[in-house]
Each structure stands twice: as structure tokens, then as C-alpha cells.
Amino acid sequence: MTDAVRTLKEWTDAARKIVFFGGAGVSTESGIPDFRSTGGLYHQEWKYPPETILSHTFYKSNPEEFFRFYRAKMLCPGAKPNAAHKKLAEWEREGKLLAVVTQNIDGLHQAAGSKQVYELHGSVHRNYCEKCGKFYDLDHILHTTGVPRCDCGGVIKPDVVLYEEALNDRVIDGAVNAIAQADLLIVGGTSLNVWPAAGLINYFRGDRLALINKSPVPRDLAAGLVITDPIGEVLSQL
């Protein structure tokens, strides 16, 4: 155990209101590619850049191509929770963790047993008809081809926040409230480049901020503790 991990262990042992703020790096150890790392989605070949395909405009104007990309690149139904997801769920069961705030849409925190999860960018597990509002699960999207349609004829849209779309106010309020109450904020697996989500950590009022990410991020200087190891590997030692 490194000195930094040992310090983090002391912090987590003493904390009573941990909030975890996570991004794509949390799920890479479950085999889900992140967006911006080498080998991530933004470095893969496609007819259009991912930022374009995953926009509201593209979804509306070219739904066939959107869903082809979405099924091929955004859905990983075989992924399982890793050590990071499991440790966070364990802390919640012990009453040490207030909430998980995640930029991920994979539902792996819930699969690990976490209950209080604020999904800033939505979830692939929720899909709704744009016409009548009927709910469809992930299996329905996986087992249809082309543009998925409801019995009423409406397009079934994944409940994920696309570029050009606003975040859910209720989710934001819950995340802000949790972060403001935290006595320890652990930020993991995110480059903090996606706004407005990254701005939420400004609501943290405590003095113990730990940052776990494989590459340096803009907030390194503000963090009391910076660890550049895989997050599952780090949390499993705590």
C-alpha cells in the first residue's frame, strides 16, 4: 500500500458522509471503454465523430445511424460491477457513504447494490416512447434492429442525456445536496472536462478531497490527495 492509499484509508475510516463522484474510468475495469483515453470512443474510427452522433440534432435527423452506433458502442450488457462499484456499495450498506454521483450510464453502481445513485447523464436501462411515454428496458433495445418503435408507433428514446440536451434538474439538485453535505469527496475516473457535471464538485464544503484518475486532471492542485492508479485497485485496498 502506497503512502497516498494509506492516507486515503485513514480518511475513509474516519469519514461518516462520503460522496463519490465518478466518470468513465470507474467502468473501464469492467470492460467498458471510456470516451477520451487512448483506445476510448473518441479515438475509434466511425463515419461521424461520436460527439456528432451522440447529439440531439443527429438523433432527430439520422436516427438509424444513431441507433446503429448506440447499440454497437454504448451498450455493454455483459459488463459486471468491478471492485470499485462493490466497495462503494459496501460503504453505503455500512452507513458511511451518502451517495454516488456518476457521469456513467451503465447502471453498474446499482448492479453492485448501491441505492443512492445520482445518474447525471441518465441510464441505458431506461427507455421511453417519445409519443406515449411507455417504458422499455435495455433488453428491448438490444433485441430490436433499426429505430426501436413503441406499439403506438412512437420512437423509443434512451433516457440518456445527449449533447445539446439539459441535465435533469431533480438529479442535479440531489447531487448538489449530497456533495454539499460530504465530509469526504472522492473524485474518481473522470477528467473533469464535461460541463456542467464537472462544476458540481464546487459545492463541496469539506477539506478532504481525494482524486483518483489514471492521468492528471485540472483539479489536481485543489485536491488534498491525488492517486494515479486504477480506481478498482485503489478502493479494494481500503
Question: What are the functions of these language-model segments?
Answer:
Residues 1-238:
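Conserved catalytic core of sirtuin-type NAD+-dependent deacylases
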